[in-house]
From Swiss-Prot:
Species of provenance: Laticauda laticaudata (Blue-ringed sea krait)
Name recorded for this polypeptide: Short neurotoxin B
Listed GO CC annotations: extracellular region
Cleaved signal peptide residues: 1-21
Family recorded in the similarity comment: Belongs to the three-finger toxin family. Short-chain subfamily. Type I alpha-neurotoxin sub-subfamily.
Length: 83
């Protein structure tokens, strides 16, 4: 009986979505702050900055993308760390 109960508890824990979802800011530089939940398994946030004729442009989101030279990229691993 105890074994059956333990098995049910383990199966319940495994089947429930107990995974944590990272939250990252995703607003462009000129917009009000917004954030979103990242896809499951995505544990990083990024802040990407570059300059063009409009000035400094900032892009934020989930993940840690590859960037070209001349683009400043900061990646971090906590909620809303990419502001």
């Amino acid at each position: 009986m105890k074994t059956l109960l333990l098995t049910l508890v383990v199966v319940t824990i495994v089947c429930l979505d107990l995974g944590y979802t990272r939250r990252c800011f995703n607003h462009p530089s000129s917009q009000p702050q917004t954030n979103k939940s990242c896809p499951p398994g995505e544990n990083s946030c990024y802040n990407k900055q570059w300059r063009d004729h409009r000035g400094t442009i900032t892009e934020r989101g989930c993940g840690c993308p590859q960037v070209k030279s001349g683009i400043k990229l900061t990646c971090c691993q906590s909620d809303d760390c990419n502001n």
